[in-house]
């Protein structure tokens, strides 16, 4: 007999992944409590300046398709910039252009939108989060998971038939009593700026630009509402000169690699960041299938490639109907849940490999190697590799995307 519980499900973490899972569970008829440690929403933190501008901005076609059912996609696309193509440059010389519509996907573009806007669009479909609620312990038992929650100075217990950790990487400790994980720290350092007034003279506002410079990569992405996100790999002493400030370093990198002083001058505040890869060994954390971990808490991949948040959204899209069916029938659904876990971990490893490849391609290189790379890219883009790259850079190799491809659909 199932013991009495407070909720069908508890989702820990009200970022975009946690909010989406809670919305989908609610859409499938599950009474769901959404807990968030932080007091404000991402939007209020962004306005106050307490949230870094190093937040995810890219939503790829599989994630846009997954968000459709709850109505979030329509709201997102009302405000997003649509990235329809990518272009590779060597300074001002265009090496190749990749049209994302070549795959014939439901959404032939990526959406560029601030993460707080994505969260707002998703939250309109789901339960309101209980904020300022920090989960300190999870205890799965037969038929129930006990959740210790601290609000202010008081700690109390909530119970649910299932609990999902969706805290982001900062809350991975909640999963560690139940699973190990592999971790790789990259040596690479980056500087990033969202510049609302920036115009990249090499392309229009629907084109993302990757500049392959021998000193390191420069990325230039359209922003919703205009402007550009600029990301450059840097060294501590670029060209033998110590960087005076992060702003100076990024402006210099943009001017040298893009060949545009005007683009460099548009840079204001700058955020430094480093990257790492972490993947848990298991996403289903207990044998009974009542405790799970998804999103960045489960798999953290290099943001060079922009797939991290999308991975988590696809985790949630696949888990929600299975978990709802399991709770509705009080049935283990062991085979289906194991298949979901296998697919999501495989997709995380694929995204991690792609991120590692992008990271390696973005590193400084000798003049000879750079010349070979610049000569090889135009030739490669005249081969079937063009479609393969389009799939790779729109998350087409994610297991969820592969199952929904038009050429894989049944009659």
Where are the regions a protein language model picked out?
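Conserved FAD-binding catalytic core of PHBH/FMO-like flavoproteins
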Residues: 162-275
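Core beta-strand elements of the Rossmann-like FAD/NAD(P) dinucleotide-binding domain
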Residues: 5-7, 153-162
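Beta1/beta-strand and adjacent pyrophosphate-binding region of the FAD-binding site
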Residues: 2-17
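Active-site-adjacent segment of FAD-dependent monooxygenases/related oxidoreductases
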Residues: 45-125
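C-terminal helical "tail/cap" subdomain of flavin- and related membrane-associated enzymes
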Residues: 322-411
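Glycine-rich FAD pyrophosphate-binding loop
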Residues: 26-55
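A conserved short coil-to-beta-strand element within the FAD-binding core of flavoproteins
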Residues: 131-145
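Conserved mid-domain beta->alpha element of the FAD-binding
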Residues: 13-27, 122, 267, 273-357
């Amino acid at each position: 007999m199932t013991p009495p519980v407070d909720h069908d499900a508890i989702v820990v973490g009200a970022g975009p992944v946690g909010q989406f899972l809670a919305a989908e569970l609610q859409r499938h008829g599950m009474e769901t409590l959404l807990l968030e440690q932080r007091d404000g929403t991402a939007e209020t933190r962004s306005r106050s300046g307490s949230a870094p501008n190093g937040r995810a901005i890219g939503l790829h076609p599989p994630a846009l398709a997954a968000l459709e059912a709850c109505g979030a996609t329509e709201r997102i696309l009302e405000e997003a910039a649509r990235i329809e193509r990518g272009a590779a440059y060597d300074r001002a010389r265009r090496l190749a252009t990749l049209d994302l519509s070549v795959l014939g996907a439901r959404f032939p573009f990526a959406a560029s939108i601030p993460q707080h806007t994505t969260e707002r669009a998703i939250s309109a479909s789901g339960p309101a989060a209980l904020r300022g609620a920090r989960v300190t312990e999870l205890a799965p038992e037969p038929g129930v998971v006990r959740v210790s929650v601290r609000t202010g100075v008081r700690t109390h217990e909530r119970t649910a038939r299932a609990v999902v950790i969706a805290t982001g990487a900062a809350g991975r400790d909640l999963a560690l009593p139940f699973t190990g994980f592999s971790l790789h720290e990259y040596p690479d350092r980056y500087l990033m700026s969202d510049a609302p007034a920036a115009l990249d003279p090499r392309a229009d506002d629907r084109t993302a630009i990757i500049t392959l410079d021998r000193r390191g990569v420069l990325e230039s992405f359209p922003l919703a509402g205009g402007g550009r996100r600029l990301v450059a790999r840097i060294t501590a002493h670029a060209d033998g000169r110590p960087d005076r400030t992060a702003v100076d370093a990024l402006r210099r990198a943009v001017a040298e690699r893009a060949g545009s002083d005007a683009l460099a001058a548009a840079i204001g505040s700058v955020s430094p960041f480093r990257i790492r890869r972490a993947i848990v060994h298991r996403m289903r954390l207990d044998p009974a299938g009542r405790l799970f971990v998804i999103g960045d808490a489960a798999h953290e991949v290099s943001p060079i490639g922009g797939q991290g948040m999308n991975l988590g959204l696809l985790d949630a899209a696949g888990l929600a109907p299975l978990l709802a069916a399991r709770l509705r029938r009080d049935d283990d659904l062991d085979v289906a849940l194991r298949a979901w876990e296998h697919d999501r971990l495989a997709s995380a490893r694929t995204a991690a490999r792609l991120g590692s490849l992008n990271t390696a391609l973005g590193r400084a290189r000798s003049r000879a190697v750079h010349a070979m790379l610049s000569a090889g890219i135009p030739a490669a883009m005249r081969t079937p590799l063009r479609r393969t790259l389009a799939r790779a850079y729109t998350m087409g190799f994610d297991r969820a995307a592969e199952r929904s491809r038009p050429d894989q659909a049944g009659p």
